[in-house]
C-alpha cells in the first residue's frame, strides 16, 4: 500500500516538473530560385536541449521529405522545390519531456521566389536625353514574367529617382534626362507574382549627349542715377536651375537698345558671367545668350525700367522659417499670372550689393529653399523677392532671416530710473545687431532683494523698459536683464539700486502741513496784534532806556539834560568828532582823573543799589579823593596813563566832551599851585562799566600838557 503511494507520488512529481518544448510558430519560407527553399520559425533559441523534425510535402501533396534540425532554420534541397509547385511545411519540436507540433503552412513557390542581382551589360546614350540599358538575370527564369526597377541620379546628387518597367524585357530605355549630364544607374527585378525583389545590380556611370546651351537666368543690379539721369547697370547671369552640370559654354553675347530707339548695341565674346553697362535714363531692353560648338542658346531678356518709372507690387506677404536642414521662404502673390520670381539674399552687414549679393530664379512656385550650410550661421540676411511678369520686374518684398541662431554675445546695458518707495523703472539699450546672433524674442528682467527670493518679469522684444512694482521700501535690490533668442538667452551686467525711504509726495505733504501751520500761526499772531496792540507791541518792540533819564543824568544835573538836548539838535557826523589836546593848567590832569573816578563810582553804586536815591559826590567841579584811588606817597608826581577816546555814538561822545570842558573850566579858575598836589594812583581798569557808556569810552588816555614844569616831568 505504502509502496504504491510512493510510486504514484514520484510519478506525479515527475509529471509536474516536466517542461515541454515551445510550439514552433511564425514559419516563414523563401524560395531562392534555382537553389533551395529555406524556412525559419520561432522561437529561435530554446532554454533546454530541443531538436526539430521538419516535414515538406511537395508535388502538390504527392511527395514528402523529412529531416532533423538542431536550429530554428532549415533549407530544403533544390530537387524538392520546383516552381510553380505548392508545398506545405510542418515543424515538430521535441526534448526529453515530450513533443510539440506546429501548424501546417502552405507556400506557392513562385510567390516567394527571390533571384540574384541582375547583370547590366551596357548603358548607351541615345539622342540627347536618353539611355538604353541592356541587362540579363543570373538565373534561367524559364519564361516567367518579370518586373524591373531602374534607379538613377546625377553624380553630384544623393537623391535617387526610381522607375518601374512592367513586363520587363532585357532592354530598357530611360528617358527624360538632361543633356550632357553624368548619371549613375542601378537595376533590380522580381517575378511578377513574387513579393521579393532581387538586390541592386552593380552601379554604372554614363554621360548623356551634348546639345546647345540652355537659356540663362538673367538679373541686374541698378546703381543710383547721376544728375543727368545716367546710371550704371550691372548684368548678372548664370546657368538656369536644372541645367546640365557638364554643359560646355564658349562665351556670351549681349545686346541692348533703348525702347524709344532702334539703335541696337552688341557686345560679343564675353567670357565672364557679369558685365557693367552705362545706360541713359530711359527704359532699355537687354538680352544675353550663350554659345558652344553645337550652337547658341535662346535669349534671356530683361527690361531695365526708366529712372522715374514706378514699379508694381505683386507680393502681399512673405515669411521665412527653418525646416531642418533648410531655410524656407514662402510668399503670397496678389496676381496668379506671375509665375517667375527672383530671390536675392545678402548679409545685412555687407557694405555693397556686389559681390556679396546672391540670387536665384524661381518658377511655377511661391516658395524658395536653401540649405542652411550654404549660409553663414549667426548672420542676419536680407532676403528680397522680385516678381517678374514677362520681361518686367516688379517691386520687391524684403524680410530678414537667420539660417542658424545662437545666444547673444552679450546682454543688454541696464539702467534704473524713477526710483520710488515701491516702484522702479528698468531701462536698457538694444544689443547691436552684430552681437545678437539671432532675432531677440523677448527680454526677461530679473530682480532680487537683498537676502530675498529672485523674481522675474518678461516683456516682448520691442520693449526697452520695464516697470517694477510691489517693491519693499528702503531695500537694496539687484537687477539684470536677459535677452533671449530661439537658441537661448544671455544675461546683462548686474546693477544695484535702493528704494526710497520717503517719497516726494510725502515730502510735499509734510512741507505743506508745516508751512500751513506756520501760516495759520502767523495769521493768528497778526490778528491778535490787531485786536490787542498794547500786549504785542512790548514783545516785538521793547522800550529802549533814554540815557538822559539815567542815573548819570541825575548826577550831572539839569545842565547835562540841556546840553544833551542842545547837542541833539546839532547832530553831525560823529566819526569826525575827535578829542583834541589843548593848553591846560598843570593840575588839570589830576582833577580830571578825580572827577572821572567820582563819576564811575556814582554809576556803579547806582547799578548795585538798583534805584537808591543817594547820589555820591558834590558839585561837578569839586576836587575829592576817590575811595578807589588812594593818595600816593608824597614827593612823587602823577603817573601818566593813556586815555583812548573812541567815537561810538553821538550822545555818549558829546556828553563826555562837555564834562571834560566843564572840568577844564573849573580847574582853570584854581591857582596854579594845584598842580603840585600829591600824585594819585591810576584808576582800576577791571571795574565794571555802565552799560550806557560802554560804547562811548572803552579806554582812557591821559594827556600831558606841554607847559608842565620841568620838575614835574622829572618826578614822572
Curated annotation (Swiss-Prot):
Known glycosylation sites: 36, 48, 64, 382
Locate the Fibronectin type-III domain: which residues?
23-115, 117-211, 213-304, 305-403, 408-502
Q: How does it sit in the membrane?
A: Single-pass type I membrane protein
* A GO MF term: cytokine binding
Q: Where is this region: Disordered?
A: 622-641, 648-696
The UniProt PTM text for this protein says: N-glycosylated.
UniProt tissue specificity: Expressed in a subset of dorsal root ganglia neurons. Expressed in spinal cord and trigeminal ganglion (at protein level). Expressed in skin, testis, bone marrow and thymus.
Which key words are in the record? Cell membrane, Cell projection, Glycoprotein, Immunity, Membrane, Receptor, Repeat, Signal, Synapse, Transmembrane, Transmembrane helix
Q: What happens when the gene is disrupted?
A: Mice do not develop dermatitis upon Il31 overexpression. Decreased levels of immature myeloid progenitor cells in bone marrow and spleen but normal numbers of circulating blood cells.
> Which residue intervals are topologically Extracellular?
19-499
Where do Polar residues bias regions lie?
670-679
Tell me where the signal peptide lies: 1-18
GO BP of this protein? acute inflammatory response to antigenic stimulus; cell surface receptor signaling pathway via JAK-STAT; defense response to other organism; glandular epithelial cell differentiation; monocyte differentiation; positive regulation of cell population proliferation; positive regulation of tyrosine phosphorylation of STAT protein
Query: Is Transmembrane helix set as a keyword in this record?
Result: yes
Q: Which InterPro entries is this protein grouped with?
A: FN3_dom, FN3_sf, Ig-like_fold, Type1_Cytokine_Rcpt_Type2
* Database matches in Pfam families: fn3
Task: Say which family it is in.
Answer: Belongs to the type I cytokine receptor family. Type 2 subfamily.
Protein name per Swiss-Prot or TrEMBL? Interleukin-31 receptor subunit alpha
Natural source organism: Mus musculus
Q: Which gene encodes it?
A: Il31ra
Amino acid at each position: 500500500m505504502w509502496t504504491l503511494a510512493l510510486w504514484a507520488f514520484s510519478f506525479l512529481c515527475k509529471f509536474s516538473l516536466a517542461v515541454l518544448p515551445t510550439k514552433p510558430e511564425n514559419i516563414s519560407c523563401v524560395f531562392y530560385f534555382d537553389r533551395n527553399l529555406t524556412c525559419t520559425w520561432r522561437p529561435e533559441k530554446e532554454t533546454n536541449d530541443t531538436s526539430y523534425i521538419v516535414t515538406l510535402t511537395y508535388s502538390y501533396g504527392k511527395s514528402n521529405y523529412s529531416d532533423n534540425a538542431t536550429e530554428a532554420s532549415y533549407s530544403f534541397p533544390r530537387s524538392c522545390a520546383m516552381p510553380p509547385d505548392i508545398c506545405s511545411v510542418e515543424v515538430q519540436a521535441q526534448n526529453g519531456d515530450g513533443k510539440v507540433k506546429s501548424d501546417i503552412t502552405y507556400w506557392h513557390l513562385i510567390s516567394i521566389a527571390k533571384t540574384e542581382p541582375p547583370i547590366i551589360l551596357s548603358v548607351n546614350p541615345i539622342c540627347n536625353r536618353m539611355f538604353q540599358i541592356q541587362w540579363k538575370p543570373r538565373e534561367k527564369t524559364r519564361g516567367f514574367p518579370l518586373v524591373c526597377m531602374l534607379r538613377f541620379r546625377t553624380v553630384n546628387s544623393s537623391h535617387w529617382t526610381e522607375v518601374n518597367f512592367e513586363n520587363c524585357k532585357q532592354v530598357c530605355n530611360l528617358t527624360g534626362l538632361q543633356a550632357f549630364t553624368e548619371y549613375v544607374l542601378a537595376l533590380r527585378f522580381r517575378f511578377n507574382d513574387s513579393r521579393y525583389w532581387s538586390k541592386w545590380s552593380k552601379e554604372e556611370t554614363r554621360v548623356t549627349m551634348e546639345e546647345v546651351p540652355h537659356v540663362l537666368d538673367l538679373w541686374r543690379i541698378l546703381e543710383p542715377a547721376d544728375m543727368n539721369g545716367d546710371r550704371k547697370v550691372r548684368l548678372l547671369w548664370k546657368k538656369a536651375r536644372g541645367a546640365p552640370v557638364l554643359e560646355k559654354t564658349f562665351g556670351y553675347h549681349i545686346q541692348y537698345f533703348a525702347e524709344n530707339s532702334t539703335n541696337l548695341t552688341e557686345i560679343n565674346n564675353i567670357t565672364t558671367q557679369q558685365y557693367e553697362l552705362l545706360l541713359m535714363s530711359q527704359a532699355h531692353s537687354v538680352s544675353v545668350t550663350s554659345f558652344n560648338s553645337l550652337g547658341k542658346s535662346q535669349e534671356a531678356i530683361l527690361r531695365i525700367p526708366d529712372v522715374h518709372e514706378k514699379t508694381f507690387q505683386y507680393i502681399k506677404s512673405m515669411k521665412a522659417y527653418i525646416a531642418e536642414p533648410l531655410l524656407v521662404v514662402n510668399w503670397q502673390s496678389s496676381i496668379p499670372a506671375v509665375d517667375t520670381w527672383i530671390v536675392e539674399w545678402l548679409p545685412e552687414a555687407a557694405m555693397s550689393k556686389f559681390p556679396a549679393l546672391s540670387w536665384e530664379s524661381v518658377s511655377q512656385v511661391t516658395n524658395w529653399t536653401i540649405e542652411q550650410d550654404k549660409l553663414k550661421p549667426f548672420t542676419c540676411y536680407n532676403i528680397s523677392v522680385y516678381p517678374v511678369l514677362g520681361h518686367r520686374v516688379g517691386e520687391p518684398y524684403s524680410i530678414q532671416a537667420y539660417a542658424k541662431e545662437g545666444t547673444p554675445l552679450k546682454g543688454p546695458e541696464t539702467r534704473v530710473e524713477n526710483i520710488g518707495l515701491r516702484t522702479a523703472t528698468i531701462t536698457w539699450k538694444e544689443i547691436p545687431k552684430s552681437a545678437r546672433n539671432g532675432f531677440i524674442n523677448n527680454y526677461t528682467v530679473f530682480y532680487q532683494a537683498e537676502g530675498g527670493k529672485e523674481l522675474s518679469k518678461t516683456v516682448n522684444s520691442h520693449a526697452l523698459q520695464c516697470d517694477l512694482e510691489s517693491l519693499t521700501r528702503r531695500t537694496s535690490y539687484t537687477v539684470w536683464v536677459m535677452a533671449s533668442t530661439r537658441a537661448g538667452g544671455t544675461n546683462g551686467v548686474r546693477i544695484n539700486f535702493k528704494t526710497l525711504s520717503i517719497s516726494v509726495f510725502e515730502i510735499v505733504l509734510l512741507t505743506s502741513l508745516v508751512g500751513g501751520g506756520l501760516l495759520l500761526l502767523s495769521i493768528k499772531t497778526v490778528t491778535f496784534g490787531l485786536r490787542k496792540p498794547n500786549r504785542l507791541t512790548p514783545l516785538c518792540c521793547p522800550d529802549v532806556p533814554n540815557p538822559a533819564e539815567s542815573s548819570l543824568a541825575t548826577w550831572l544835573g539839569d545842565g547835562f539834560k540841556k546840553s544833551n538836548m542842545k547837542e541833539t539838535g546839532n547832530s553831525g557826523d560823529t566819526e569826525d568828532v575827535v578829542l583834541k589836546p589843548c593848553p591846560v593848567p598843570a593840575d588839570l590832569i589830576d582833577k580830571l582823573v578825580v572827577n572821572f573816578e567820582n563819576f564811575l563810582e556814582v554809576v556803579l553804586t547806582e547799578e548795585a543799589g538798583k534805584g537808591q536815591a543817594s547820589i555820591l559826590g558834590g558839585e561837578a567841579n569839586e576836587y575829592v579823593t576817590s575811595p578807589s584811588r588812594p593818595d600816593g606817597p608824597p614827593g612823587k608826581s602823577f603817573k601818566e596813563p593813556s586815555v583812548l577816546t573812541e567815537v561810538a555814538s553821538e550822545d555818549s561822545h558829546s556828553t563826555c566832551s562837555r564834562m571834560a570842558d566843564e572840568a577844564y573850566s573849573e580847574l582853570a579858575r584854581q591857582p596854579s599851585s594845584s598842580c603840585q598836589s600829591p600824585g594819585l594812583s591810576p584808576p582800576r581798569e577791571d571795574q565794571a562799566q555802565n552799560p550806557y557808556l560802554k560804547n562811548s569810552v572803552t579806554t582812557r588816555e591821559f594827556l600831558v600838557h606841554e607847559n608842565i614844569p620841568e620838575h614835574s616831568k622829572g618826578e614822572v
